[in-house]
Design a protein with these regions (language model features):
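Cell wall/extracellular polymer interaction/catalysis modules
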Residues: 4-132, 144-148, 153-159
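Internal interaction segment
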Residues: 161-165
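Short, well-ordered, aromatic-rich surface patches in folded extracellular/luminal domains
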Residues: 140
Length: 165
C-alpha cells in the first residue's frame, strides 16, 4: 500500500530546498583603513565544495557612509539587497585609472535610484588623494585580490550578490 502523508505535511508542505549556488556576500566590518577612515567591507565568495574566500573592500566614501543609499550620486555604500552579477570585463591597462584592470557589473534586483554599479579595484584605497573609497561600487583594496575574484567568478559562474549591513 502507498505511504500516506501526515495532515501537517499536506497543510504545511516544506518548500523544496534549493541546491547551493556560487554566491557573493558583502558585509561591513568594524575595521577601517587607518589613513583615511574608510570602513572595510568583507566581500566573500561561497562556491559549493570549495573553501570560503574573503576579500577586503570599500563601498562609498568614508564621510558618506550614512547618506541615502538609494539616491543616485549619494556616494553612499551599496543599498542592502540582492544583485545580479554580470560578466567579468577586462579593461585596457591605464584606461580607467580609478577602476583598475577589471569591471564586473552588478544590477540591483529591487527598486533603487542607484545605477552603473560594479565591482572593481580601488587603487586609491587608503591614499590621501580624495579618491579613497568609491562612488558606491564595491572597490577591492588589493589588485591581486581583484584578479583572483574575477577568475573565481568566471570559473564558478557566480551570478548573485547579497549585500548586508
Amino acid at each position: 500500500p502507498p505511504k500516506r502523508q501526515s495532515l501537517m505535511a499536506l497543510l504545511e508542505p516544506s518548500p523544496p530546498k534549493e541546491d547551493p549556488v556560487p554566491t557573493l556576500f558583502l558585509e561591513r566590518t568594524d575595521r577601517q583603513l587607518q589613513t583615511t577612515g574608510d570602513p572595510i567591507w568583507n566581500l566573500r565568495i561561497e562556491i559549493p565544495g570549495e573553501p570560503l574566500r574573503r576579500f577586503d573592500a570599500v563601498s562609498g566614501r568614508a564621510n558618506r557612509q550614512s547618506a541615502d543609499r538609494d539616491r543616485m550620486g549619494s556616494r553612499a555604500p551599496l543599498p542592502v539587497g540582492r544583485y545580479s552579477v554580470g560578466a567579468v570585463e577586462p579593461l585596457t591597462d591605464g584606461a580607467y585609472p580609478e577602476i583598475g584592470p577589471v569591471w564586473i557589473s552588478i544590477e540591483p534586483t529591487f527598486v533603487t535610484g542607484r545605477r552603473v554599479l560594479g565591482i572593481h579595484l580601488d587603487p586609491s584605497a587608503g591614499l590621501r588623494n580624495a579618491n579613497s573609497g568609491t562612488l558606491g561600487c564595491i572597490g577591492l583594496v588589493n589588485r591581486a585580490d581583484m584578479l583572483e575574484l574575477a577568475q573565481l567568478i568566471k570559473r564558478s559562474g557566480a551570478d548573485r550578490l547579497v549585500v548586508r549591513h
